[in-house]
C-alpha cells in the first residue's frame, strides 16, 4: 500500500531500523504539551465506557475559545474525518480545488464519485490563489475547498479575496470549505481567519485541528465551524457515532488551556522560518515565500532519497497535481534541527 502523506515514521523505522529526523510532517516541533499528556493519563479511567458522541464538554470549551455558539461546532477524528463527513453528507456532483493543495480533499470527493475540477496555481505567482480561482466557481460547482494557508505552498489567500469567494459560492449555490488547520501557527491569525464571515454565510464551513499546533497527530482531533446547524447535523450522521475518543476529548480541552505553549510555538516559527528559507536559498535552491510552518522548495529529484539514507525525511511533492518531481516541502522545526537539515543537505548537494 502506497501512502500519499508525509509523517510515515513507522514506514521509515521498518525500512531503516531507526527513527528519522522528520521534516515531512508539519506538526509543532516542541512536542506534546505536558498538560495534554497529563489530561490523557487522567482520562484513562473513562476508557471502559463509550465516549460522549456529542463532545459536550469539549464543544463548550471550544465555544469559549473560538467565541462562537456551541451549536456551530462539530468535533471529529481529525480534520480528515470532517472532510469525509462533509463530502458524504453533501454527495456533490462537481467540486473545485486549487492545484496544488492538500490531497485528502480529492480523495474524499472521489470516494462519492464526484468530478474534481482543479484550477492550476502558477509558479510565476509563487502558487498564490488569485481572482482566477474565484471566477472558476460557477453554477455547476457544488463544493469548493480552500486551504488557508495552502498546503504545500504556505501561501495565504488575502481576506478580501476570501470574502469574494464566499459571496461567489453563495451566488452559485456552492458550499465553501476554508481549511484553517495551519492558520493558528501564524501570529496574524486573527486578522486572517474567515470566522467573522460565518454569521452571514451559512454556506461556509471552517476546518480546524489540534493535530498540528499541539503536536497531537496521533490523538486525532479536529473540528468544524459552521452557522448552518442542519449541515453539521448531516455531517454528524454521515459517520460513526463515537468518532472522538474520550482520551482525545480530554486532550483537546487541556490543549485549549496551553496558551503559553501555543505562543511559544508561534514565536519559534516566526523566528525560524525566514532563517531556514535563507539557508535553503544559500544552497542555490528556489524557495516559495510562504507564511506557514513549512516551506516549499525545488531541488534535484534525487534529494529526498539521499536525505533518507542519512536519516532525514522531507515531503516529496511530486505527487501533488500542479507540481512536478523535484518540489519538496519541509517543516520548520527548532534551530538545531533546522541546522542539521541544512548541513545534511550541504553534504548531499556538494
Predicted ranges, named:
Residues 31-33, 54, 203-288:
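PLP-dependent aminotransferase class I/II
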Residues 69-73, 180, 202-203:
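Short acidic capping loops at alpha-helix termini that bridge into adjacent secondary structure
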Residues 309-310, 319-350:
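PLP-dependent enzyme catalytic core of the Aspartate aminotransferase-like
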Residues 51, 63-85:
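Short loop-beta-helix segment that forms the pyridoxal 5′-phosphate
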Residues 123-187:
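Active-site phosphate-binding strand-loop segment of PLP-dependent enzymes
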Residues 270, 280-311:
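Conserved PLP-binding catalytic core of the aspartate aminotransferase-like
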Residues 88-146:
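PLP-dependent aminotransferase-like
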Residues 1-49:
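N-terminal "arm"/small-domain region of PLP-dependent enzymes with the aminotransferase-like
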Amino acid at each position: 500500500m502506497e501512502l500519499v502523506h508525509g509523517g510515515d515514521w513507522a514506514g521509515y523505522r521498518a525500512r531503516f531500523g531507526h527513527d528519522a529526523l522528520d521534516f515531512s510532517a508539519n506538526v509543532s516541533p516542541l512536542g506534546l504539551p505536558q498538560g495534554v499528556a497529563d489530561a490523557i493519563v487522567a482520562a484513562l479511567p473513562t476508557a471502559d465506557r463509550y465516549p460522549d458522541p456529542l463532545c459536550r464538554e469539549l464543544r463548550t470549551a471550544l465555544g469559549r475559545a473560538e467565541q462562537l455558539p456551541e451549536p456551530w461546532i462539530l468535533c471529529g477524528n481529525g480534520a480528515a474525518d470532517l472532510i469525509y463527513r462533509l463530502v458524504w453528507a453533501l454527495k456533490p456532483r462537481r467540486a473545485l480545488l486549487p492545484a496544488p493543495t492538500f490531497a485528502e480533499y480529492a480523495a474524499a470527493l472521489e470516494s462519492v464519485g464526484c468530478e474534481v475540477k482543479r484550477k492550476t496555481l502558477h509558479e510565476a505567482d509563487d502558487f498564490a490563489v488569485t481572482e482566477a480561482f474565484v471566477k472558476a466557481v460557477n453554477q455547476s460547482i457544488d463544493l469548493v475547498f480552500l486551504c488557508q494557508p495552502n498546503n504545500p505552498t504556505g501561501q495565504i489567500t488575502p481576506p478580501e479575496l476570501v470574502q469574494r469567494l464566499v459571496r461567489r459560492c453563495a451566488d452559485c449555490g456552492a458550499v465553501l470549505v476554508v481549511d484553517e488547520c495551519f492558520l493558528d501557527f501564524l501570529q496574524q491569525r486573527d486578522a486572517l481567519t474567515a470566522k467573522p464571515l460565518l454569521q452571514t454565510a451559512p454556506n461556509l464551513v471552517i476546518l480546524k485541528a489540534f493535530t498540528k499546533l499541539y503536536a497531537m497527530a496521533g490523538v486525532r482531533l479536529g473540528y468544524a465551524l459552521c452557522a448552518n446547524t442542519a449541515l453539521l447535523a448531516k455531517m454528524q450522521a454521515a459517520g460513526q457515532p463515537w468518532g472522538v475518543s474520550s482520551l482525545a476529548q480530554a486532550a483537546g480541552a487541556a490543549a485549549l488551556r496551553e496558551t503559553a505553549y501555543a505562543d511559544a510555538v508561534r514565536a519559534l516559527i516566526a523566528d525560524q522560518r525566514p532563517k531556514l528559507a535563507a539557508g535553503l536559498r544559500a544552497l542555490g535552491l528556489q524557495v516559495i515565500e510562504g507564511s506557514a510552518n513549512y516551506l516549499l522548495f525545488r531541488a534535484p529529484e534525487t534529494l529526498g532519497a539521499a536525505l533518507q539514507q542519512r536519516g532525514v525525511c522531507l515531503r516529496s511533492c511530486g505527487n501533488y497535481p500542479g507540481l512536478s518531481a523535484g518540489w519538496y516541502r519541509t517543516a520548520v522545526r527548532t534551530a538545531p534541527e533546522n541546522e542539521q537539515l541544512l548541513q545534511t543537505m550541504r553534504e548531499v548537494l556538494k
